[in-house]
Amino acid sequence: MGKLVIISGPSGSGKTTICKLLEKDPLVKKSISMTTRLPRHSEKNGKAYHFVSTNDFEEMIQKGELAEHAEYCGSYYGTPMNALREALEKEIIYLLEIEVQGALQIMEKFPEAISIFLLPPDKKT
């Protein structure tokens, strides 16, 4: 049985750095979030994010197909429920690098998940 590990914290707290280090372990796989924002020129669908339309995202919300979701800067971000269920069936550690609101939603649906909250070393960071 797999494990869900949530890494959350404010911008600059080191979430991405920690996740990149953990991903070096072959038993660790990072979740790919879904978003309605437009891809940046260097981004490919399915690598950093799964890019979907606002209509598709809102339909997934209505159908309960997202484990967590939030709106940030006018775009939706979320994690598909089926991705988490599939990860739990495997012998892997599934990392979710998400903001606090999303972490709380995941913890409600998957209380066995491990949640790690990172804080930057000081207010300047």
Where are the regions that the model predicts?
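Hydrophobic anchor at the beta1->P-loop junction of P-loop NTPases
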Residues: 7
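P-loop (Walker A) phosphate-binding loop of NTP-binding proteins
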Residues: 10
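ATP-binding Walker
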Residues: 13
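Walker A/P-loop
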Residues: 16
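The feature captures the helix immediately C-terminal to the Walker
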Residues: 19-20
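Post-Walker A helix-loop "phosphate-sensing" segment adjacent to the P-loop in P-loop NTPases
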Residues: 23-32
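ATP-dependent small-molecule kinase phosphotransfer cores
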Residues: 35-94, 100-104
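Conserved phosphate-donor/acceptor-positioning beta-strand/loop module used by diverse small-molecule
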Residues: 94-99, 109-125
